[in-house]
A protein has these predicted regions:
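N-terminal acidic leader/helix
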Residues: 1-26
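A signal for specific C-terminal beta-sheet/loop modules enriched in small/flexible residues
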Residues: 10, 61-62
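Short alpha-helical "recognition helix" segments of helix-turn-helix
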Residues: 30-31
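Short acidic, Pro/Gly- and aromatic-enriched capping/linker segments at domain boundaries
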Residues: 36-50
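Short, acidic, Ser/Thr-enriched surface-loop or helix-capping motifs
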Residues: 54
Length: 62
């Protein structure tokens, strides 16, 4: 199981982008599958300097 709250942000970044690319249509599908709060996940990535790019279905450095 993925610990979205405490996993190292770089590992989480890599893992989430891989899951988005290979297994999920979009971020909503991913958070629903794992039972994760979307806003909390977005905030965690935003604090680390990443933003979800809906058009590319991945997080990118901003």
């Amino acid at each position: 199981m993925i610990n979205f709250e405490t996993k190292d942000i770089m590992l989480l970044y890599s893992l989430v982008n891989m899951k988005l690319r290979d297994e999920f249509l979009d971020l909503n599908d991913l958070v629903n599958y794992y039972g994760v709060d979307k806003n909390e996940l977005l905030n965690r990535f935003n604090k680390a300097g990443y933003k979800y790019m809906e058009s590319e279905n991945q997080f990118k450095r901003v």
